[in-house]
Every structure is written in C-alpha cells, then in structure tokens.
Design a protein with these regions (language model features):
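Predominantly flavin-linked oxidoreductase catalytic cores and closely associated redox partners
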Residues: 60, 67-70, 77-82, 86, ...
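Alpha-helix C-cap/termination motif
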Residues: 12, 47-51, 111, 151, ...
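Internal alpha-helical scaffold of NAD(P)-dependent oxidoreductase catalytic cores
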Residues: 5, 85-171, 214
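NAD(P)-dependent Rossmann-like dehydrogenase/reductase catalytic/cofactor-binding core
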Residues: 157-255
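Rossmann-like NAD(P)(H) cofactor-binding subdomain of soluble oxidoreductases
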Residues: 3-10, 22-85
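Hydrophobic anchor at the start of a short beta-strand
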Residues: 13-17, 54, 71, 116, ...
Length: 255
C-alpha cells in the first residue's frame, strides 16, 4: 500500500517520500502515513517525533492506536496488488482526531482520486467486517463452487461469466438480484443440491446450509410488500478539498 500511495501522490504533484523502513522518525515531514500491519501501528507511531500529523491506512483500527497525538486515517476500500493500484473513484474511509486532521485525511484521499467517506471509530469493525465479507469471503465462496464443479469434470473458468453477471446484477439491483431455486421456492432442487454437496464435498455442507438459510431470508424479505429493500445513500463524506499541509508527506511501511 505504501508504495502505491507514494507513486500516486508523486503523479499528483505532492512531494512524497518513502516508503521508509524501520527507524524512520518523520523528522522534517508535515504528514506521516503509516502503511504497516495493524498490530504494528502503535509501535510505529511511537517512533515518530512530535510535530508531524500521523495517520494510518487500517480499515479496522481506530485513531486510539496512534496514542495521544493528533491523528488521522485513510483506508482505500480496495485490494492493492504488487502491480500497484488505481485509486480513481474508489471509496475510502477517513477519520480525524479533530477538524483539521479530518480535513487533511479527506484532502489526501481526494488527491489520490479516492472518494472519502467518514467512518467513526465505533463503526470501524463493522465497516471492515463488511468489506471482508464482500471481498475476501467472495473468493472463498467461488472457490467452494469451483471445487464442486470440478467433481463434474469442469474447470472454474465456466463459472466466471455467471459469477461476474451475478455481481454486476447485485451492484445494480441489490437484494432483488437474487435468482435460482431458493428465490423461486423450488425446494426439490434445493434438496437435490444438498444431497450432491453432501456426497461429493461433504465439508461444504455447513456452508451450503448457511447460504440456503440466508438466501431464504433474503428472498422472503424481498417479496414482502413494503419491505423497503433497495439502495441506500453512502455515508456522510468528510470535508472536501484542502491542503495536505505544508512541507512533504511521507509513508512508512515498517515499524
């Protein structure tokens, strides 16, 4: 993450340095962004000298991990690979210990091309858990489907168009995008599916049952008049444009 952020800031004309390693203390920098594992944020923050505004890129952690100093956070809601990242149009959770820190976090996000949305510390665990379900568990789910498909002699690539279309439909329609035997109330087919899962991939029965139950509740809610299922407006965004502070910005990738 640190390398991707530094590269994007330089493209935007911000005099960013780094990523820095162990022993970096932030002397001479106006803003220091800690791009380290969650468990290392506190130790890394303690190494920064007084003066710079210190932030982190964790989605699950609050500002308390930075100690008593003024702090901020910017968490791009995306997956960053070794090939880099395109931050344009991606949502980012921002927070600040005061108005000035929040303004800098929001300005940093917009400079990167991100869309800042304020997420308070109390809501961070729920925010990050939802992100994990949407991204990490999606891979687990599709891998389970591919494993079962392989017992029919077919590769996972046959599932890609189906999975892609389902995700695109959900993006457009939300819960109403649910299709298939559970949505139709076809209990016979659901029972047939469960039997073959139990026979060929018995370790997936628990996952299958949980997904059927969740899908049944979703289908029932979607078919209830006045259920109110639909899209929701994004959360409140933080302050928009503003300076990221005088001097240079820096990121550190290790405590």
């Amino acid at each position: 993450m640190g390398s991707a952020i530094v590269a994007a800031l330089r493209v935007a004309g911000v005099p960013a340095t780094g990523p820095h390693g162990r022993g970096y203390d932030g002397a001479g920098d106006a803003v220091v962004l800690l791009c380290v594992p969650d468990d290392a944020i506190g130790v890394a923050a303690q190494q920064i000298v007084p003066g710079p505004l210190v932030g982190h890129c964790s989605g699950a952690s609050g500002l308390d991990v930075l100690g008593d100093r003024s702090g901020m956070s910017v968490h791009p809601l995306m997956t960053v690979t070794r090939q880099g990242a395109d931050f344009a149009g991606v949502w980012a959770a921002v927070a600040g210990s005061d108005r000035a820190a929040l303004a800098i976090a929001s300005s940093l996000a917009t400079t990167l091309g991100l869309r800042p949305v304020r997420v308070d510390d109390a809501d961070r665990p729920a925010y990050h858990a939802a992100a994990a379900i949407a991204a990490n568990f999606l891979v687990t789910l599709e891998s389970a489907a591919a494993e079962l498909m392989s017992t029919a002699g077919l590769d996972r690539e046959v599932l890609v168009p189906l999975a892609t279309a389902a995700l695109q439909n959900w993006a457009r329609s939300g819960p109403s995008a649910l299709t298939g035997p559970v949505a139709r109330g076809d209990t016979g087919t659901v029972a047939l599916h469960r039997r073959v899962v139990a026979e060929r991939t018995p370790h997936l029965v628990g996952l299958f049952d949980a997904l059927v139950g969740a899908s049944q509740r979703l289908a029932a809610a979607d078919s209830t008049p006045g259920s109110g299922i639909g899209s929701a407006e994004p959360g409140t965004t933080g302050p928009g444009s503003g300076s990221t502070g005088s001097g240079s910005a820096a990121t550190t990738s290790a405590p």
